[in-house]
Structure formats: structure tokens, C-alpha cells
Amino acid sequence: MSFIPVAEDSDFPIHNLPYGVFSTRGDPRPRIGVAIGDQILDLSIIKHLFTGPVLSKHQDVFNQPTLNSFMGLGQAAWKEARVFLQNLLSVSQARLRDDTELRKCAFISQASATMHLPATIGDYTDFYSSRQHATNVGIMFRDKENALMPNWLHLPVGYHGRASSVVVSGTPIRRPMGQMKPDDSKPPVYGACKLLDMELEMAFFVGPGNRLGEPIPISKAHEHIFGMVLMNDWSARDIQKWEYVPLGPFLGKSFGTTVSPWVVPMDALMPFAVPNPKQDPRPLPYLCHDEPYTFDINLSVNLKGEGMSQAATICKSNFKYMYWTMLQQLTHHSVNGCNLRPGDLLASGTISGPEPENFGSMLELSWKGTKPIDLGNGQTRKFLLDGDEVIITGYCQGDGYRIGFGQCAGKVLPALLPS
């Protein structure tokens, strides 16, 4: 239990302690903090208290504007920091609890802080690891018998996304312009995307990387995963449909990707590990680990249109539905010798479950625009309208506490039409 008051339904109890980067009006310098209840503990203020065997030599990582340096230190440093912070914030520990002056400087209300991207993202890769999502899309665009492509059950399919347009929660997303072909019998046209979609995803940040040419074996993959965030991989379905052959997504994806600001460490999630769905056929040996696991993370997508007093829940899903694991994704990414670096972002792909209410995109929820999604108050959607705000939340439910991720939110702005 922490000496900082934490509500039972708070995302950020002492069991969590996610890392983020924030600034305040009084101090606009981006710096690293840890969320506890509705407060932020400013690690740049207390960095001198990290006196363990690893962090005593690396206190300066908490004086950086991003988490990259801390991510790169590896598991020993992360575990040392977590144990120290849980002890420091404990109701029984006087060091910070009873130091009135230090507490005054070190704690900031989350409501008064501006959040930033947690890391400088050198590279961003998006996977396609939900079997239900891949099957749904395959049925819509091909047929039931050929829903999954021949490679899908043998490797975690992915593509390289655009790191420069990954933004933190709360950043508006402008409706993209692009080339589309709405009528197969007519030439393509240029204009504003009409089929704008959201995608419910999660992503993880890479910790220590690997040298070019040296793959990461699956037995060591967990050592390279720092923590997880929520993600909305905004998608322009009409632009994507016309452009994606033969090289895959490009402008239909690269206009914006939203992530939540707080990175939940893997040690906070391990109590919620569950067996991974059975993989059949058995993957090749380099993708096999002894006890494949995933995480029981409850996920929701809410949509609030202009004029709506309350957001409508359009999707309830769970990360445990994913087919390919994070360890397999990271291992496969490096198997050809590709070098990963601290702060790289690897995303799950759309998270869809077995029931229609578990579908993680409007493409699926509206079944390619044929079934309007009821928002209540007489409003429906097939795809996103200007002014719509999409809010993704997620948490693991413990006994009397929850490990939450905060919000991953973004509002759609109108396209910038050519003059």
C-alpha cells in the first residue's frame, strides 16, 4: 500500500508504476515520471536516491527527455528501479513520506501535466497477429475458404510503419487526403478519405537491442521487451485498398498512429499471464517457446461524436485473443539479423475476438460498411466522421486493484482540402 492515496478503480496503484514523459507549465522541460494514483513522481527530482548496484552508476537516465536510455539498460536496471520505487512509495517507508520539502517538489498532479511520447521511436513495426481479425478481413475481401493467406499460420506477418507520425494520446488526427478508386469501372480519384477507421491495438517498446546480423533467440526475447502501451492504428480503408498491392500498406496508415503515454512494465503484467491459444501447425523451431503465454488485458473502444454527451462503447475485447506472442514477434523481427534499438515500437495488429462485440475495427464492426454501428441517441456509424473522438482503455483486473494503461485518445479533424 502506498502513502499516496489510490482509489480502488485507479489505473495506477503501487502494483503498476508505469513510466512516462511529462512537462508542466511551470517547467516545460520534458522529463521522466512514474504514475501513482492521480499523481506523477518526478524521477529527475529523486534520481540521487537510486543507489542500487546498477542505477547508482546511471542516475542520469532519469534526467533525460525520453525513456530510451533507461530502456537500453536492460532488465537488471528495470527490476532494481521497480523494487526501489515500490519500497520508496510504501506507506511504511519514511524516506519520501516524511520529507515534506522533497514531496512538494517531487509530486505533480497528473491533471496539471502535459504528456509526451515516452521514447524517441527510431522504428515502428506493425504486426497482424489476431487470427480472428485476419480471418474476418480475408472473408470480406476474398472468401471463407481462402480467408487466411498461406503464410499466416507459419509466421507473424508484419510491415514497417512510419515512426514520425506516431503521436501521444490527445493529439488530434487529421483526415487524410489520398488516391482512391471507389468505382472499379472508372479511373482513380484524389480526395479526402471517406472510409476512415480506427484499429484497437497494443504495442511494446524494445529495451536493449541487438547487433546487426545477430538474431535474438526466443529464449532471450523477454529480456528485450520493456513494457506495453495501448495503440490506435488509424486506417484510411479506401486509400489502403487501392494502394496496397503488391507492397502492402503505405499512405493508408502513415498519416497517424496514437499511443497511450504510460508504459506499463512487463513485471507489472506478469501476474496476468495466461496460456497462449494453441498454434496449429506447430511453428518452426526458432518460433517455439516452452510455455507460450499472453496476457489477460481487458480492452474497450469508446466513440464520442460531436453533440454526444456521453461516449458509446463500440468494442470490448481482450489481448489474450492474439495468436502470435510478443516473444515470437520480436524473435521473428530479428531472425534475419535485423537490428532492433531501444525505443523501437512493435505493435500487435488489430485485436479481435470470437464474438462480433470483440471486433477491433469499424471495418469488422460494420462488416465492410453493411451494418451500421448503433451509438445510441439515434446516431450510427459505419466509419469515422469529422469530430469523432476514439478513446481506447485497457486494464488487468487484480484482487482489489487493477493494472491500467490510462487512455489512448484522438479526435478526427477535417481534411485539408486543396485550395
From Swiss-Prot:
Residue sites binding substrate per the record: Y128, R142, Q240, Y244, T350
Pathway membership: Amino-acid degradation; L-phenylalanine degradation; acetoacetate and fumarate from L-phenylalanine: step 6/6
Gene Ontology CC entries for this record: cytosol; extracellular exosome
Pfam family, one: FAA_hydrolase
Highest taxon above the source species: Eukaryota
Consequence the record notes for mutating A35T: In TYRSN1; atypical mild phenotype
Coiled-coil annotated residue ranges, if any: none
Protein name: Fumarylacetoacetase
Annotated residues for binding of Ca(2+): D126, E199, E201, D233
Gene: FAH
EC class: hydrolase
Chemical reaction(s) catalysed: 4-fumarylacetoacetate + H2O = acetoacetate + fumarate + H(+)
Variant or mutagenesis effect after changing R341W: Does not cause a clinically relevant phenotype; results in lower enzyme activity
Membrane spanning stretches: none
GO biological process: arginine catabolic process; homogentisate catabolic process; L-phenylalanine catabolic process; lipid metabolic process; tyrosine catabolic process
Quaternary structure (record): Homodimer.
UniProt keywords, alphabetically: Acetylation, Calcium, Disease variant, Hydrolase, Lipid metabolism, Magnesium, Metal-binding, Phenylalanine catabolism, Phosphoprotein, Tyrosine catabolism
